[in-house]
Structures are given as structure tokens and as C-alpha cells.
Design a protein with these regions (language model features):
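A Zn2+-metalloprotease active-site environment signal
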Residues: 2-7, 13, 17-23, 27-296
Length: 296
């Protein structure tokens, strides 16, 4: 029995001694395939997907949304004109920003979706933007809408979607490599499965969720700078999230288990960024700031 145990121990040791080198080789290969630095925050970003593929996938997703019979485009000029007006200003600000090269390459397109029950907007790599009319009551004004659109445009320009896909690929590959090492080591299968499950949860909570929150904060930060450069009062972003908090009844899910920062965290961060955003806004001619139309 002792001899068998020692043999298993030696096999496990050899497997795990190879494991770190296996992981190191995989991580090195994946990481060196592509990376970039965020021009605003200096944050290093893993990018394993070419931009052309992101744009192609986004174009297909945008076409699917537009062709969905449930997603009817608005035909009301009162809804379309303010969205197009704000989008034009935010896009021009993006073309002057540190993302100027990408922003000028995008083929921008804006669609207003008549869906009064959905508080949403999105921007995809390649410049495809959709705004749901359900966001109007919480945005309230064109400046509030600029805060929303600035945030979404930054997600596209910063390639947050591509980065998340890269992070998922890296996490899955790492877990697979660990699984192989556990299997080769002759470890107890039940314990191995439990360990892999725990590692999966750890990757989600410890790596992927914080990165998602970081993406949201990054989009809030750069988005408010774009809105200010477009001539919109950046303080509207604070009021926007205060209204979001009121609509949620003051309740927000645990930030630890959420892909988004809490409303309180967002408001606090936005207040801190006003020292940078307000001088930009004050140096620009003010943009029109009409109230958005009521839902009907």
C-alpha cells in the first residue's frame, strides 16, 4: 500500500511539475497573439480576435436586430431627430478623441427602435448604434442621452466585447490545461471534478466579473469625456444614474457577483471625474439640450 501510494505521489508530482510549464506555454502563446493598451487609462488589454472579425460579427448581429419583427424601427421624427442629433455630436467627438483612427474608420449607422418597455442602447464595433425609446424617460434630456450614447460608443471603440471573448478563451484554455494535468496525475476523479468546478467559479468571480466591471467603469469614464467634448453637460451622467437607482427601488445586486458596478459606485466615480470633464465641457460651445419626447 505504501509503495502504491508513493508511486501515485511520484506520478502526481511529475504531472504537476510539468503543469506550470504547460500553462506557461499556453498563456505565453495566447497573450502574445495580440494585445493593446487603452489610450485613456493605460490598461493592458488581451486581444486575440482580429478587429475585422469583430466588425463582421457585429454587422450580422445588427442586421439580425433590424430584421427581428419585434424590433420595429421608430418612424416618429420626434424620437428619431434628437437621437440622430446627439449621435452625430458624440461621433464627431469620438473622431477627435484618442480613438480617432478607429472612429474615423467605422461606418456609423444609427437606428431608433420603438420599444417603450426596454431601457437600452448599444453600439457595436464598426459603428452600428441602436437606441430603444424605453431609455427616454430615464435619460430625460439630450445631455442625458449623450451620457448613454457616449458610454456605449466607448464599449465599441475600446473593443470591450472582443476583450471579453479573449478573456473567456484564455480562462477556458487554462482550465482545460489544469484538467489535463489533474487527469495525467491520477488524482481522484471526484476531487478533480470538484476542484475544476471551484476553479471555474473562481475564474468567473475573481477574473471575468471584475473585468466586466472594469469595462463598465472605463466606458463611464471615457464616455463622459466624449459627451463633454460634444458640448453636453457631463453632470447629466450623475443625474442619469441617480434616476437609474430610483427606478431600481434603491436596490442593486451585490457588486461582487455582478458584471456592472453598483449605482452608488458609478455615481461616486462620475463625481470624481467631473474635475476632468467639466473643463472640457466649458471649453466647448454648448449643444442643444432639449427634453426627450414622452412615450406614447
Amino acid at each position: 500500500m505504501a509503495h502504491e501510494w508513493n508511486g501515485n505521489t511520484r506520478r502526481q508530482f511529475r504531472a504537476f511539475s510539468r503543469g506550470p510549464w504547460l500553462l506557461f506555454g499556453i498563456l505565453t502563446l495566447l497573450i502574445t497573439t495580440g494585445c493593446q493598451t487603452n489610450p485613456y487609462t493605460g490598461r493592458w488589454q488581451l486581444m486575440m480576435m482580429p478587429m475585422s472579425q469583430e466588425v463582421q460579427m457585429s454587422a450580422q448581429a445588427y442586421a439580425d436586430v433590424k430584421s427581428d419583427p419585434k424590433m420595429k424601427p421608430s418612424t416618429d421624427p420626434r424620437e428619431i431627430e434628437p437621437v440622430k442629433r446627439v449621435a452625430a455630436r458624440v461621433i464627431e467627438a469620438a473622431k477627435r478623441s484618442k480613438y480617432s483612427e478607429m472612429a474615423n474608420q467605422f461606418e456609423w449607422e444609427v437606428t431608433v427602435i420603438k420599444d417603450d418597455k426596454t431601457m437600452n442602447a448599444f453600439a457595436l464595433p464598426g459603428g452600428k448604434i441602436a437606441v430603444y425609446t424605453g431609455i427616454f424617460p430615464v435619460a430625460k434630456t439630450e445631455a442625458g442621452l449623450a451620457a448613454v450614447m457616449g458610454h456605449e460608443v466607448v464599449h465599441a471603440l475600446a473593443r470591450h466585447g472582443g476583450e471579453r471573448m479573449s478573456q473567456n478563451t484564455l480562462a477556458q484554455t487554462t482550465l482545460q490545461a489544469i484538467g489535463i494535468a489533474l487527469g495525467v496525475s491520477g488524482a481522484n476523479p471526484v476531487l478533480s471534478q470538484a476542484g475544476m468546478a471551484a476553479l471555474g467559479v473562481g475564474a468567473q468571480v475573481g477574473v471575468l466579473l471584475p473585468f466586466s466591471r472594469k469595462h463598465e467603469s472605463e466606458a463611464d469614464y471615457v464616455g463622459v469625456l466624449l459627451a463633454a467634448d460634444a458640448g453636453y453637460d457631463p453632470r447629466e451622467a450623475i443625474q442619469l444614474w441617480q434616476r437609474m437607482g430610483e427606478l431600481s427601488g434603491g436596490k442593486s445586486s451585490s457588486e461582487f457577483m455582478s458584471t456592472h458596478p453598483s449605482h452608488e459606485t458609478r455615481i461616486q466615480q462620475l463625481e470624481e471625474w467631473m474635475g476632468e470633464a467639466m473643463p472640457i465641457y466649458q471649453s466647448k460651445p454648448p449643444a442643444p439640450n432639449h427634453e426627450l419626447p414622452p412615450l406614447h
